[in-house]
Amino acid sequence: MKQKMGTHKFRFSDMMPHSWLYKLKGMSRSSRKHHLSSPKHLSSADASSSRKLRDPLRRLSSTAHHPQASNSPPKSSSFKRKIKRKTVYKPSSRLKLSTSSSLNHRSKSSSSANAISDSAVGSFLDRVSSPSDQNFVHDPEPHSSIDIKDELSVRKLDDVPEDPSVSPNLSPETAKEPPFEMMTQQKLKKPKAHSSGIKIPTKIVRKKKKERTSQVSKKKGVVKSFAIVLSSVDPEKDFRESMVEMIMENKMREQKDLEDLLACYLSLNSSEYHDVIIKAFENTWLHLTQGLSISL
């Protein structure tokens, strides 16, 4: 009998009934399937229920050897994953009102979820961030932010008038019409021989300086005068009448002023009218020197 007992080896399965063994196998399979099918971000309630489904023998043995460790939760891989906390930043002031209201709603829901999980599991879940907080961090609305500088630049562009050439004080009728410009004779240029009309100066500004050169006086006198182009039938008569008008208006009595007047007529008109101009000037000169009244 003793020899038989010495050769026979007892196993742990011989001491337990077969029904217990089948139950333990089924529990281990269900726990493995539950861990594989569950997502990475398990909620606090699911984590606590999965811990309660462990085998009773392991729990009894752990409480017998480590009585203080029964209060602390067992370590698991899912708990280590959740320890890595993500920093949550406050929303910037550039967000719209609609986005801020939605964020407030999300923060309220996340705070209520955290309160339920704290009451169910314990104080150690304070370090773990809930999935609602992760949704709060990753906001899928990139177009909700608006730059304040862009709004100011758009307002400034709206204030600028469309057409810079038109001033706000002028009416559209006056803005369309170009201003009247007086064309002056800037340089002493002899006109071409095939010109159709004669040119008559209308105004000559006299200078009181006695000492001046003939060239400078001629150029300045012509620059400050205006010329009118006329088509004439009797050019000698027209030249004579215009010379008399110029002498009477400007009160020309000095020889230098009369010479400037003659040079002005010669420079404005072509060479074909020079003989006619000289004849008209001689007639007016004779009348002035003799002191006779100028008859038209």
From Swiss-Prot:
One GO CC term, this protein: nucleus
Function as written in the Swiss-Prot or TrEMBL entry: Transcriptional repressor that may regulate multiple aspects of plant growth and development through the regulation of BEL1-LIKE (BLH) and KNOX TALE (KNAT) homeodomain transcription factors.
Further information: Plants over-expressing OFP3 have no visible phenotype.
Residue ranges, compositional bias (Basic residues): 78-88
Gene Ontology biological process: negative regulation of DNA-templated transcription
Comp. bias intervals (Polar residues): 60-69
Entry's localization field: Nucleus
Biased composition (Basic and acidic residues): 136-159
Residue ranges constituting the OVATE domain according to the UniProt record: 228-287
Record GO terms (molecular function): DNA binding
InterPro entries: DNA_bnd_dom_ovate, Ovate, Ovate_C
Record note on quaternary structure: Interacts with BLH1, BLH3, KNAT5 and KNAT7.
Compositionally biased intervals (Low complexity): 92-115
Name this protein carries in UniProt: Transcription repressor OFP3
Keyword Heme: no
Keyword Ligase listed: no
Ranges where the record places region Disordered: 27-115, 131-196
Record keywords, A-Z: Nucleus, Repressor, Transcription, Transcription regulation
